């Protein structure tokens, strides 16, 4: 079996698995539990703090067949297909590679049609600030008058580059950097599960070196294990 980097292998699949971001998790769980769903969410924060991970978990919760208190079950067909990247009603777009209006127009035209399998069509647009001005303008009309069956989850490291007209139509969550202690404790958990010995002081060093990014911390841990 090919080696899978730790950041991918140990990516959280439920809200309960997440490290940190309790303020975001609590708000999303409450909204899901009470059915107070916004049509567009914007997740902001530095790299590696959980924006895309939370977006995927939220996508699962929105379409999970057995969600309890906003937590996806992880077992139903919707959850397993989202985890494997095969869910027809979830589209992930990297705006850094798809900046133009043609890319977004195709998405928006598709959004008008009802979901194939789930309750909602979910569009995750990563690094949304990279979209062109014309692409933002095209997206704005859909954000103003969204179909009932569509949810947008936008993620960015640079919200200041997102037009205010788009920001004002999204429910915004600011993700915080991880503390050194949060990182060190999670690295210890991963190493225990991987049956790799470690020194606690070394994990503290990795936690500080990661500058609050869990993904960077796990990448550094991969390098340390290889040495």
Predicted segments — roles?
Residues 7-8, 186, 199:
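Short hydrophobic/aromatic segments of transmembrane alpha-helices and their interfaces
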Residues 64, 119, 149-150, 179, ...:
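Non-transmembrane, interaction-prone segments in cytosolic or luminal domains
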Residues 66, 194-195:
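Short, polar/flexible loop-turn hinges at active-site or ligand-entry regions and domain interfaces
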Residues 94, 172-184, 195-197, 208:
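Conserved AAA+ ATPase "SRH/arginine-finger" region at the nucleotide-binding site
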Residues 98, 177, 211-214:
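Short, solvent-exposed loop/helix junctions and linker helices
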Residues 108, 184, 188-191:
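A conserved short alpha-helical segment within the catalytic HATPase_c
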Residues 123, 188-192, 202-209, 215-227:
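C-terminal helical "lid" of AAA+/P-loop NTPase domains
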């Amino acid at each position: 079996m090919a080696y899978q980097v730790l950041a991918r292998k140990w990516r959280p699949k439920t809200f309960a698995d997440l490290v940190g971001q309790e303020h975001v998790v609590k708000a999303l769980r409450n909204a899901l539990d009470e059915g107070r769903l916004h049509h567009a969410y914007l997740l902001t924060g530095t790299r590696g703090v959980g924006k895309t991970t939370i977006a995927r978990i939220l996508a699962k919760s929105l379409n999970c067949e057995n969600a309890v208190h906003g937590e996806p079950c992880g077992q139903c067909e919707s959850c397993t297909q989202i985890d494997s990247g095969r869910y027809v009603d979830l589209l992930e777009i990297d705006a850094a590679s798809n900046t133009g209006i043609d890319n977004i127009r195709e998405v928006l035209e598709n959004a008008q049609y009802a979901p194939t399998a789930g309750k909602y069509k979910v569009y995750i647009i990563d690094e949304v600030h990279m979209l062109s001005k014309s692409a933002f303008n095209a997206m704005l009309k859909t954000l103003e008058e969204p179909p009932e069956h569509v949810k947008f989850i936008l993620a960015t490291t640079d919200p200041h580059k997102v037009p205010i007209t788009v920001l004002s139509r999204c429910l915004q969550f600011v993700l915080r950097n991880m503390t050194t202690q949060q990182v060190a404790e999670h690295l210890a958990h991963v190493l225990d599960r991987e049956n790799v010995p470690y020194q606690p002081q070394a994990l503290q060093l990795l936690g500080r070196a990661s500058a609050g990014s869990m993904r960077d911390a796990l990448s550094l841990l991969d390098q340390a294990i290889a040495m």
